[in-house]
Amino acid sequence: MAARFKAMLYLHEPNTDKHFLPNLKYYINVHFFVKESTGLLSNQDFIRFSLEINLFFQRIMKEHLLFIETSLTPVETALIAEAAILKEGFEQLLAETVHYADRAISISAINSNEFVTPYTLKAEELTSKFTGASINTEITKAEYELTGLQSFPDGYFRESSERIVGDLNQRSMNLLEKVISFKKKLLALSAECKIFIVLYDEIIDHITQEAEYYLELLKALRNKDLPGRTVCEELNFWNYTMAGHASFIDGLLDPTETNLKETARTFIDGFDRLVKGCTRSTENQIKRESLQLTEKIRNFKRSATEGILRCGIKSIIIPLLADHVLREANYYLRLLRMMN
């Protein structure tokens, strides 16, 4: 039976030094680590993978909660307070992760702009100004200062580091389960017209799926493993996500922004086609096409973010949402480049 790709795999430069792989047999296939036999991640891989995943997804989660907090109507005081508390919880976790990640993550991850972009701080400042919501921008400033290592000396990672990161993963998972429950509650209330929230139900469902994806990763890491997904399962998740982003952008742009809306709809059609066309026999072609289309939507999102920040685009897209979806495209691009 063919080996299944371990989803998200290794989003950093591979280290094939046998010193770091005492319990696993790996081989490299198109720059992926494919698991041939069961076993545990090495200490180094567990720590670095955990930190990179948390740096990306903890920020994504806290921003989801910010979007919810600022999209509820003022009468929903309890729900607004719950969103704010959960957001602050992920801010605290992210601050810890940033502290431990310095010199412990890959340079390629830092340079990908998936953790922060050149626009993140300004987007946070404007979003806080426009909404009155609290955003801890000191975390972002610290992330701009992160440095990575291309190689690690023997003994760099100790058992204490593994315990610290394992505890961070567990606390992230505990909070994430509460966030998923909260999002599902909001979706049910909105679907039953018991609340009014300035977020499409499809957006709430979208951010719930992303949280469940993150939870799947953390559950696997608890066993020092990675979730097993086929290539098409991984591609379909992210291509569906990119199509969703294009759909939301189209819906939030002012009707007068006809060119931008038309471009967004082109991306919807393109990513939908990739999702429908991915099979075992077509996966290599879909990987290449996904890379090409994701580079284009990344450029589109980057231009849109710049336009929104300088007040050059008419929309109801909050600045941090523009930067948020740009980072997700950057994350997917790094994965695709490794696959291709």
What are these regions (language model features)?
Residues 23-340:
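Surface-exposed peri-terminal alpha-helical interaction modules
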Residues 1-37:
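N-terminal amphipathic/basic-hydrophobic helices that include classical n-h-c signal peptides
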